[in-house]
Amino acid sequence: MSTTHNVPQGDLVLRTLAMPADTNANGDIFGGWLMSQMDIGGAILAKEIAHGRVVTVRVEGMTFLRPVAVGDVVCCYARCVQKGTTSVSINIEVWVKKVASEPIGQRYKATEALFKYVAVDPEGKPRALPVE
């Protein structure tokens, strides 16, 4: 995982709005929803690298740094940190932009984790990543 940075590391792969239906019992955005968004965003980059279907096989070091509020813009940034024969490891950071609550315009990193994806064939069996 990356060290602390003041700017997102990687490419913007997903941007969405945190909605009331995604809250936990405390009124903050549910961590599982954030993890789902990260998996979707990471899979977008992994599919581009693999030139096809991938499956998530591992999530490492999930760290929730700050809460996310309803109305916040949630941005997933992803970067490839390792390629294997069939797998790719993607570091994913979630950055939030406050647009519905104070302080308006503030940006901060809310969470980060390392996701590992494996390229698979139509039968779901691992296949080699393309050689670049």
Curated annotation (Swiss-Prot):
UniProt record similarity statement: Belongs to the acyl coenzyme A hydrolase family.
A Pfam family per the record: 4HBT
Record organism: Escherichia coli (strain K12)
Function recorded in the entry: Catalyzes the hydrolysis of the thioester bond in palmitoyl-CoA and malonyl-CoA.
GO (cellular component) term, any one: cytoplasm
UniProt keyword annotations, A-Z: Hydrolase
Record-given protein name: Acyl-CoA thioester hydrolase YciA
Cross-referenced InterPro entries: Cytosol_ACT, HOTDOG_ACOT, HotDog_dom_sf, Thioestr_dom
One biological process term in Gene Ontology: fatty acid catabolic process
Example of a GO MF term: long-chain fatty acyl-CoA hydrolase activity
Translocase as UniProt keyword: no
Enzyme Commission identifier(s): 3.1.2.-
Phylogenetic lineage: Bacteria, Pseudomonadati, Pseudomonadota, Gammaproteobacteria, Enterobacterales
Source organism, top-level taxon: Bacteria
PROSITE patterns: HOTDOG_ACOT (PS51770)
